[in-house]
């Protein structure tokens, strides 16, 4: 049975307001403040897109297997490929290892190599890899995943073979259209599996994150974006820790926060700095992007687009989201 992603709503120009009734009154919106003046047309523009969890459960692996024993995922992304290709940077959470055979789904994921090839061919050009499944195949799985991502020249953040590699490549600096973006990535844990030295998984530790933010600032980025694997699974609202960390990250100098892990969509906020009037996007959870999960609200998620413009300053000019649904 094939698994394919469908766009439910394209280009929802709602300025990233959440439609969650329980949160509607507490969401700051950009509908009045992010109109696009003519002067912006001459400014440099960077379009980013974020999606949630790229997963491979056993049903998906079985469905992708061909008669020749290879795996074909092209049909999974055919309806979203155009949307992915419309942006400058498309960033996704790779929530599987590429640990080699035997290929397995939950609870210890190891996806076929062809899954990564399909992700790359769809247009995703940045991956974050720090999540609770990073160590599902131990040291060999972590290192093989990094090796394969590097073989396709896909920039990535979150897991590293050793401290030297982390120091060299982290924070991940993305340069596009004259912009410099520092990308950070952390996870709450790895399902109780301890990382094997010298490998490194970026865990959520405020002391370490604070240092990483300061290193990011030395790179003179136009924006610092933190991708956080956090929260409680299947909960439609962020918990206290998510709310605290989001505020703390912004206070420390992060410009935008993008969350994953709950497997369901959680609210989006746009916060305004009272001193600078800068706009900061907080997405508590993008939900799933592609999976075989059957629990309520886990069969889809968000694709969130944000547009940065730069003239005399860098600012969030617009944001919007599309809904995706996995047909199976």
Per-range role (PLM):
Residues 19-328:
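Acidic, metal/ion-coordinating pockets
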Residues 14-15:
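C-terminal motif of bacterial Sec signal peptides marking the signal peptidase cleavage site
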Residues 1-4:
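Positively charged n-region of N-terminal signal peptides that target proteins for export
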């Amino acid at each position: 049975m094939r698994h394919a992603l469908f766009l439910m709503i394209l280009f929802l120009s709602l300025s990233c307001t959440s439609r969650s009734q329980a949160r509607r009154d507490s969401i700051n919106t950009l509908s009045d403040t992010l109109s696009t003046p003519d002067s912006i047309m001459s400014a440099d523009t960077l379009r980013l897109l974020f999606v949630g969890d790229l997963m491979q459960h056993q049903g998906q692996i079985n469905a992708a297997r061909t008669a020749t024993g290879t795996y074909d995922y092209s049909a999974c992304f055919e309806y979203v490929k155009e949307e992915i290709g419309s942006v400058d940077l498309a960033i996704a959470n790779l929530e599987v290892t590429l640990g080699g055979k035997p290929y397995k789904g939950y609870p210890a994921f190891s996806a076929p190599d062809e899954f990564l090839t399909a992700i790359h061919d769809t247009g995703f050009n940045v991956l974050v890899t720090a999540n609770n499944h990073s160590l599902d195949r131990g040291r060999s799985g972590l290192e093989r995943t990094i090796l394969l991502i590097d073989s396709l020249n896909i920039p990535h953040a979150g897991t590293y073979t050793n401290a030297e590699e982390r120091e060299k490549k982290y924070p991940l600096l993305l340069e596009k259209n004259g912009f410099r973006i520092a990308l950070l990535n952390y996870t709450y844990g790895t399902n109780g599996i301890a990382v094997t030295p010298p490998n490194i998984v970026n865990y959520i530790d405020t002391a370490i994150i604070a240092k990483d933010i300061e290193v990011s600032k030395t790179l003179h980025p136009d924006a610092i974006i933190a991708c956080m694997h956090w929260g409680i699974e299947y909960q439609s609202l962020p918990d206290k820790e998510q709310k605290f960390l989001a505020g703390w990250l912004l206070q420390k100098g992060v410009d935008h926060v993008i969350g994953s892990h709950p497997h369901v969509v959680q609210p989006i906020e746009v916060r305004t700095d009272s001193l600078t009037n800068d706009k900061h996007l907080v997405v508590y959870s993008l939900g799933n992007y592609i999976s075989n999960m059957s629990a309520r609200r886990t069969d889809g998620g968000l694709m969130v687009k944000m547009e940065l413009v730069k003239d005399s300053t860098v600012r969030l000019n617009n944001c919007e989201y599309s809904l995706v649904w996995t047909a199976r």
